[in-house]
Swiss-Prot record:
InterPro entries: Ribosomal_uS7, Ribosomal_uS7_bac/org-type, Ribosomal_uS7_CS, Ribosomal_uS7_dom, Ribosomal_uS7_dom_sf. GO terms for cellular component: cytosolic small ribosomal subunit; ribosome. This is Small ribosomal subunit protein uS7. The keyword tRNA-binding applies. It holds the Pfam family Ribosomal_S7.
Amino acid sequence: MSRRRAAVKRDVLPDSRYSDKVVTKVINSIMLDGKKSIAEGIFYSAMDLIKEKTGQEGYDIFKQALENIKPQIEVRSRRIGGATYQVPVEVKADRQQTLAIRWLTTYTRARKEYGMIEKLAAELIAAANNEGATIKKKEDTYKMAEANRAFAHYRV
């Protein structure tokens, strides 16, 4: 643990199209080398592509996908008497969102499609349908928590 006091959380500004702070966080996560306008272009183009592919509003698919990705439980390492246990703990709301966004961008980049717009659109559609690599990551996290349920009484 750090001996300093906790860092102040800086609030992000809502994005221009949807006026949503979560969208801004996803755009910031997609962004590489500080090129925010390119990241915005990728995200908004992916939303348009989703609407074109599914016929539903891209923003609604995005919201559903993010809700499906958010983990309720995760495992945390806890050292007790020379042994390290993976202790299942509930995830706070802000960490749920952070993990969901992190997993989304990580597994979007790992996809095989050509171009980030296609990758992001495909991963969001898959996640909205409870499919894809991000949902698999969430399920793997749940399996780890279930396997280590015996250590749940060790609070982290």
